[in-house]
Swiss-Prot record:
Subunit structure: Interacts with LHX9. Interacts with SLK; leading to negatively regulate SLK kinase activity. Interacts with LMO4.
Gene Ontology CC, one term: nucleus
Subcellular location, record wording: Nucleus
Lineage of the species this protein comes from: Eukaryota, Metazoa, Chordata, Craniata, Vertebrata
UniProt keyword list: Nucleus, Ubl conjugation
PTM note: Ubiquitinated by RLIM/RNF12, leading to its degradation by the proteasome.
Full protein name: LIM domain-binding protein 2
Species name: Homo sapiens (Human)
Source taxon at top rank: Eukaryota
Gene assigned in the entry: LDB2
Length: 373
């Protein structure tokens, strides 16, 4: 037997401690990783076109971004649409941030028909501030993302609930200004509010006004109208929607029961079976064009069950009805075979055209003549 190698990093592929390859990163988290890389590739010369391309790559056309946090004057909740998302990320860097990335820990994923939901209760937004002092801000909270279930996997909803934040200052900076009380007093003050800069907070407050004005701005851009005319048109259309009569509530359509159509064979077989059971004599069938009301009494008709357009329950059982026709005489016309034999539905060589052999009853009715002695 060969001895085990002394290399501590060696592991035999046939041993119990075989090291497998690292599994691939989960796709939704990988999209956040790609977004972090794209934010790191930002330069000081990045203009609005760069931010629009960034938002187009990672956000859907109807995406929404929501931030929830609590300030000194109470809880706040801001929701912005797709057109305002690029400007939101740009204001983060305009407030003195040099680096921005998100860290997701222990995220939970749920797959739906057309979307993937990622719920991360331990999300950290890390921002590096170069102004006025080098400070690292860690904003912790819960991040809920909804991705589209397609090849692009863009974000449809972004909801970040901030719980707490921490501002970290390097010890080296404190040691450099240990003899300067003014600088130490400045370093002791927070540079953010709940991890957000003043630029970002002011922009979110402005979005409260800008979000309802998206319709006015889009109309002005499309029809080249003056702001006053755009406002008049929007107000008139909104007034029309308000005074318009309410739409009638959609009534649930009644489930219609379909009755199975009686074919030629089923009609003839059912009538023949009923005749055999009632009279106990020869099997006789009626014509194929007889209506349902002219059939033999005590006919049991089974309706089709409701397969679509309703919930399954007692109403979806097969409906069995009994048809009674007191005007119909079962003994009238059943013994007349000429109409049946001359029916065009039967061929010339049909076995039904041949007359059945004489039975004992016919022999008794027509006795043969006796020979004269």
């Amino acid at each position: 037997m060969s001895s085990t190698p002394h290399d501590p990093f060696y592991s035999s592929p046939f041993g119990p401690f075989y090291r497998r390859h690292t599994p691939y990163m989960v796709q939704p988290e990988y999209r956040i990783y790609e977004m972090n890389k794209r934010l790191q590739s930002r330069t000081e010369d990045s203009d609005n076109l760069w931010w629009d391309a960034f938002a187009t790559e990672f956000f859907e056309d109807d995406a929404t971004l929501t931030l929830s946090f609590c300030l000194e004057d109470g809880p706040k909740r801001y929701t912005i649409g797709r057109t305002l998302i690029p400007r939101y990320f740009s204001t983060v860097f305009e407030g003195g941030v040099t680096d921005l990335y998100y860290i997701l820990k222990h995220s939970k994923e749920s797959y739906h028909n057309s979307s993937i939901t990622v719920d991360c209760d331990q999300c950290t937004m890390v921002t590096q501030h170069g102004k006025p002092m080098f400070t690292k801000v860690c904003t912790e909270g819960r991040l809920i993302l909804e991705f589209t279930f397609d090849d692009l996997m863009r974000i449809k909803t972004w909801h970040f609930t901030i719980r707490q934040y921490r501002e970290l200052v390097p010890r080296s900076i404190l040691a450099m200004h240990a003899q300067d009380p003014q600088v130490l007093d400045q370093l002791s003050k927070n540079i953010t509010r709940m991890g957000l800069t003043n630029f970002t907070l002011n922009y979110l407050r402005l979005c409260v006004i800008l979000e309802p004005m998206q319709e006015l701005m889009s109309r002005h851009k499309t029809y080249n109208l003056s702001p006053r005319d755009c406002l008049k048109t929007c107000l008139f259309q909104k007034w029309q929607r308000m005074v318009a009569p309410p739409a009638e509530p959609t009534r649930q359509p009644t489930t219609k029961r379909r009755k199975r159509k009686n074919s030629t064979s089923s009609t003839s077989n059912s009538s023949a079976g009923n005749n055999a059971n009632s009279t106990g004599s020869k099997k006789k069938t009626t014509a194929a064009n007889l209506s349902l009301s002219s059939q033999v009494p005590d006919v049991m008709v089974v309706g089709e069950p409701t397969l679509m357009g309703g919930e399954f329950g007692d109403e979806d059982e097969r409906l069995i009805t009994r048809l009674e026709n007191t005007q119909y005489d079962a003994a009238n016309g059943m013994d007349d075979e000429e109409d049946f034999n001359n029916s065009p539905a039967l061929g010339n060589n049909s076995p039904w055209n041949s007359k059945p052999p004489a039975t004992q009853e016919t022999k008794s009715e027509n006795p043969p003549p006796q020979a004269s002695q």
